[in-house]
Regions:
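Sec/Tat signal peptide C-region and signal peptidase I cleavage site
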Residues: 20-26
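Bacterial N-terminal signal peptides
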Residues: 9-20
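Sequence/structural signature of beta-propeller domains
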Residues: 26-161
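N-terminal secretory signal peptides that target proteins for export/translocation
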Residues: 1-6
Length: 161
């Protein structure tokens, strides 16, 4: 029995060491969460009261990230310059693009796309140029933005919701 004790002790410590090394490796290979933007004060680097129930995010190769904020019927723009540095882009003086509401039903943008085709989807109500961003809304409408403080409803499907 005496001969088994040192071997069992050694095997146990090798197993503990392997477990510890595996845990250390998992921590090194893991990730760190950094909350960049939130509507909850103190939760992230930037507190933005417009970022309520965000659904969709898009961007172009030259634009900041656009967030569709269903809870405020807006889109906000954020520039991310490295892993953890974010700034809100001051578009239209207040940092938002308004997404139009309808008279009834649920409101707010849910999804969006960036339109890179400069000869397609001209904005009715805008300056006549192609839409830069197109939004799908809970109210069944499709809105488009080319410039200015507000997107414009382009298509309405009654009873879509």
């Amino acid at each position: 029995m005496r001969n088994l004790f040192p071997k069992a002790f050694l095997v146990t410590w090798i197993a503990v060491g392997a477990l510890w090394a595996g845990t250390l490796h998992a921590q090194v290979a893991g990730f760190v969460q950094v909350n960049l933007v939130s509507d909850i004060p103190g939760l992230a680097t930037i507190t933005d009261s417009n970022l309520v129930n965000p659904w969709g995010v898009s961007h172009s190769t030259t634009s900041p990230f656009w967030s569709s904020n269903q809870g405020t019927s807006t889109a906000t723009l954020y520039m991310v310059t490295d892993r953890t540095t974010v700034t809100k882009v001051n578009i239209n003086g207040n940092g938002i693009v308004n997404i139009p509401k309808t008279a009834a039903g649920p409101q707010g943008p849910t999804g969006q796309v960036n339109n890179t085709n400069t000869s397609s989807f001209p904005v009715n109500g805008g300056d006549g140029n192609s839409a830069h961003f197109i939004f799908a809304n809970l109210n069944g409408t499709i809105s488009a933005w080319d410039t200015g403080p507000t997107a414009f409803i382009q298509v309405t499907t009654p009873g879509a919701v």
